[in-house]
Amino acid sequence: MTTRYIFVTGGVVSSLGKGIAAASLAAILEARGLNVTIMKLDPYINVDPGTMSPTQHGEVFVTEDGAETDLDLGHYERFIRTKMNRRNNFTTGRIYEEVISKERRGDYLGATIQVIPHITNAIKEKVLAGGEGHDVAIVEIGGTVGDIESLPFLESIRQLGSELGRERTLFMHLTLVPFLGAAGEIKTKPTQHSVKELRSIGIAPDVLVCRGDRAIPANEKAKISLFCNVEERAVISLKDVDSIYKIPALLRSQGLDDLVIKRFNLTCNEADLSEWENVIYQEANPNGEVTIGMVGKYIELPDAYKSVNEALKHAGLKNRVTVNIKYIDSQTVEAKGEEVLQGLDGILVPGGFGERGVEGKIFAAKFARENNLPYFGICLGMQVALIEFARHVAGLEGAHSTEFNPQTPYPVVGLITEWINEEGDVETRHESSDLGGTMRLGAQLCHLKEGTKAAVAYDSATCVERHRHRYEVNNNYIDRLEKAGLVFSGLSSDRKLIEMIELPNHPWFVASQFHPEFTSTPRDGHALFEGFIAASYAYQKRDID
């Protein structure tokens, strides 16, 4: 299969939405019957985002094969059916790590290692490997043209453009076309300078996607075309919209996909965007609304919970309700208690690491349990629900996770290597997909207990979901917690690890060790989120009635 490559760059300012634009174009091409994948090349020195602060970088998106990647890969999976993997995202740090490792092994036979050709060759190899087996591979270059960090990536795609030829490569550049209120006009000069910068390093853009708060008039498009040496029909206006899921139709209406198909000399069907039209209709025509309190520790940057935010919206689409998310700092819950949890239709406690704010999350789980308020716990959200139940229902006063209190008298949650069995020995359990010894990453099978809310929601005896955690439920406390009324509704593939818990006599008190948000999409939703939002809407209606 001959793969065609679309390289997406950005200029003028950051945060223009390259990832959304790339994913939207991919969605149109997929709707035309093409097999499409998307890659993200990140210029930072970190090897991967796994240890980066969520408040600086946003969430870490976990792929099926266990790669910790940029949140843009979440956008890609929500827009197209292709599943991402570790080949879809790599960083400067990863490239340098691999090149230096090869140099230490002597793979370069004593050659002087340089950015060109060794680093650029390594980048090109990864791009070509990532696109293998697909009709079209869209490659997003992180950062902004002009950044020193991006230069090796830009040089690499310049070389690929030359080596593969025009019939297999296309360069798409996103720029900002601002409207100056004082002057009352659109300004194209920033775009002209950005294209000049790009051309100075040997890349001539074939398509310009011009971002702004309004549509660009035809005369301004003609001006941009003239000064940037781009066909007028290849100057695409991408104005701000109230829903990112409108963007595929917006790009389609301006013929961007036709331009790509013609450039690559492909023969394919017209785009069928009916699924996206249905999503937009559902979003625009809700029958009600719910307010969900998200109790977390990274709430100053909503992108830290990007996939959770989107999954809640998807569940709203399926239930025909608008989901309003109220972000609540778990430390504020510690300070003010019930006061900040009033007026909610449901509580969601997402994943997280570290001790800060954990007692606030435990309090939120207790509040939901005692008030029959729908509760959904994810990863740490399941662990705090378990800790709360152990303390206040099962009589295990002082129960905790060894992550937060290594001296707890009742370690109901701990590292899998920390369990002490009845003989007093340290018990070690792991699954073949464990990485790094203690972190469970990637998609794994879960067995669901018949008749539970989890099994009913999935309408299946099993599910496959993605993990990202180090700590597990301590199996030594399962019997005692079950006798107190807790239901362990999900077990790992070997049935040795707890994956889900729930309360039977509660409208919706369900929690999972895995991260279901990573597999939710606007077209398909996700069973657990849909069940949670349905229960939250029913709770609200009960109050009204």
Curated annotation (Swiss-Prot):
<dbReference type="InterPro" id="IPR017456">
    <property type="entry name" value="CTP_synthase_N"/>
</dbReference>
<comment type="pathway">
    <text>Pyrimidine metabolism; CTP biosynthesis via de novo pathway; CTP from UDP: step 2/2.</text>
</comment>
<dbReference type="GO" id="GO:0003883">
    <property type="term" value="F:CTP synthase activity"/>
</dbReference>
<dbReference type="InterPro" id="IPR033828">
    <property type="entry name" value="GATase1_CTP_Synthase"/>
</dbReference>
<keyword id="KW-0460">Magnesium</keyword>
<keyword id="KW-0067">ATP-binding</keyword>
<dbReference type="InterPro" id="IPR029062">
    <property type="entry name" value="Class_I_gatase-like"/>
</dbReference>
<feature type="binding site">
    <location>
        <position position="14"/>
    </location>
    <ligand>
        <name>CTP</name>
    </ligand>
</feature>
<feature type="active site">
    <location>
        <position position="517"/>
    </location>
</feature>
<keyword id="KW-0315">Glutamine amidotransferase</keyword>
<dbReference type="Pfam" id="PF00117">
    <property type="entry name" value="GATase"/>
</dbReference>
<feature type="binding site">
    <location>
        <begin position="15"/>
        <end position="20"/>
    </location>
    <ligand>
        <name>ATP</name>
    </ligand>
</feature>
<comment type="similarity">
    <text>Belongs to the CTP synthase family.</text>
</comment>
<keyword id="KW-0436">Ligase</keyword>
<feature type="binding site">
    <location>
        <position position="72"/>
    </location>
    <ligand>
        <name>Mg(2+)</name>
    </ligand>
</feature>
<feature type="binding site">
    <location>
        <position position="140"/>
    </location>
    <ligand>
        <name>Mg(2+)</name>
    </ligand>
</feature>
<keyword id="KW-0665">Pyrimidine biosynthesis</keyword>
<feature type="active site">
    <location>
        <position position="515"/>
    </location>
</feature>
<comment type="function">
    <text>Catalyzes the ATP-dependent amination of UTP to CTP with either L-glutamine or ammonia as the source of nitrogen. Regulates intracellular CTP levels through interactions with the four ribonucleotide triphosphates.</text>
</comment>
<feature type="binding site">
    <location>
        <position position="352"/>
    </location>
    <ligand>
        <name>L-glutamine</name>
    </ligand>
</feature>
<dbReference type="GO" id="GO:0004359">
    <property type="term" value="F:glutaminase activity"/>
</dbReference>
<feature type="binding site">
    <location>
        <begin position="380"/>
        <end position="383"/>
    </location>
    <ligand>
        <name>L-glutamine</name>
    </ligand>
</feature>
<feature type="binding site">
    <location>
        <position position="223"/>
    </location>
    <ligand>
        <name>UTP</name>
    </ligand>
</feature>
<feature type="region of interest" description="Amidoligase domain">
    <location>
        <begin position="1"/>
        <end position="266"/>
    </location>
</feature>
<feature type="domain" description="Glutamine amidotransferase type-1">
    <location>
        <begin position="291"/>
        <end position="542"/>
    </location>
</feature>
<keyword id="KW-0547">Nucleotide-binding</keyword>
<dbReference type="GO" id="GO:0042802">
    <property type="term" value="F:identical protein binding"/>
</dbReference>
<dbReference type="GO" id="GO:0046872">
    <property type="term" value="F:metal ion binding"/>
</dbReference>
<comment type="subunit">
    <text>Homotetramer.</text>
</comment>
<dbReference type="GO" id="GO:0005829">
    <property type="term" value="C:cytosol"/>
</dbReference>
<dbReference type="GO" id="GO:0019856">
    <property type="term" value="P:pyrimidine nucleobase biosynthetic process"/>
</dbReference>
<feature type="active site" description="Nucleophile; for glutamine hydrolysis">
    <location>
        <position position="379"/>
    </location>
</feature>
<dbReference type="GO" id="GO:0044210">
    <property type="term" value="P:'de novo' CTP biosynthetic process"/>
</dbReference>
<feature type="binding site">
    <location>
        <position position="403"/>
    </location>
    <ligand>
        <name>L-glutamine</name>
    </ligand>
</feature>
<dbReference type="InterPro" id="IPR017926">
    <property type="entry name" value="GATASE"/>
</dbReference>
<dbReference type="GO" id="GO:0005524">
    <property type="term" value="F:ATP binding"/>
</dbReference>
<feature type="binding site">
    <location>
        <begin position="147"/>
        <end position="149"/>
    </location>
    <ligand>
        <name>CTP</name>
    </ligand>
</feature>
<feature type="binding site">
    <location>
        <begin position="239"/>
        <end position="241"/>
    </location>
    <ligand>
        <name>ATP</name>
    </ligand>
</feature>
<dbReference type="Pfam" id="PF06418">
    <property type="entry name" value="CTP_synth_N"/>
</dbReference>
<feature type="binding site">
    <location>
        <position position="14"/>
    </location>
    <ligand>
        <name>UTP</name>
    </ligand>
</feature>
<feature type="binding site">
    <location>
        <begin position="187"/>
        <end position="192"/>
    </location>
    <ligand>
        <name>UTP</name>
    </ligand>
</feature>
<feature type="binding site">
    <location>
        <position position="72"/>
    </location>
    <ligand>
        <name>ATP</name>
    </ligand>
</feature>
